[in-house]
From Swiss-Prot:
Name of this protein: tRNA uridine(34) hydroxylase
Any one GO MF annotation of this record: oxidoreductase activity, acting on paired donors, with incorporation or reduction of molecular oxygen
Record function comment: Catalyzes oxygen-dependent 5-hydroxyuridine (ho5U) modification at position 34 in tRNAs.
Top-level EC class as recorded in UniProt: oxidoreductase
Pfam families: Rhodanese, Rhodanese_C, UPF0176_N
Organism whose genome encodes this protein: Corynebacterium kroppenstedtii (strain DSM 44385 / JCM 11950 / CIP 105744 / CCUG 35717)
Key word Hydrolase present: no
One Gene Ontology biological process: tRNA modification
Entry keyword annotation includes tRNA processing: yes
Rhodanese domain mapped to chain residues: 130-225
Amino acid sequence: MSMPKIVLFYVFTPLADPEAIRLWQKALAEKWNLKGRVIISKDGINATLGGELNDVKRYCRETRSYAPFKNADIKWSEGEGDDFPRLSVKVRPELVTFGAGDELKVNEEGVIGGGTHLKPEDLHHLMDERGDDVVFFDGRNAMEAEIGKFRNAVVPNTTTTRDFLNEIESGKYDDLKKRPVVTYCTGGIRCEVLSVLMKNRGFEEVYQLDGGIVRYGEAYGNDGYWDGSLYVFDKRMHMEFGSGTESLGHCVECGKPTAQFVNCANNDCRKLFLRCDECTAAHKHQYCGECEPALV
């Protein structure tokens, strides 16, 4: 019986020879028939891979056998069997492209000078103690927050992670600099970097959600501070943490609640936008709001 799984993990640690790690990871993923994306830099590894359960287990076991990766927090979720079109293993200057690689410092323990890590239960303790003074700060692209976010979260106007520096330097969030700010993202990696950038720019009390939305959803499902669906970077495109999840997103055609993104049919655009299955089925073409007036 087929049991497809998806794993997500990252490790910040100094790597003396990223290219050697790339070759090893590529061979390892190919050996176990995995597809997905692995990014390696001098600061560590960031991976999202899918395959059959036993193959993924073997890959994880061998990856953790390398001492710098032995404590990798590997997050598991259900796959569909064809979640990624191919395998990509690359070396890049940054694990997450904020455009601020010179600000990030890592050692064998991880990122130096980042926000205080909060496990899901620690976040609830903070909320009990500080209440409305706590600010959730979304560390993802704004599009991802259209279908799910922490309650009353601040969602910066970002299309890519490169936009965050301009956002936090714009002055529009200066009123948050003396408040407890909890950064969050899908699995935690973006907030490892974002929290450093925010602290370097005068945010005095910065936290990061340990394990990201994934670990929080596993712990509290729909019974905590998370609302809606989680955008994911594979064929599923979204996942939920329990039955009865109410989507925050709405179809651009009919306004019906939906968590389903589709790509604009204009090959020069390919922008993702929300469209329910019924409206997609009823239209031969699917263009985003910017392209439709010009092409339809």
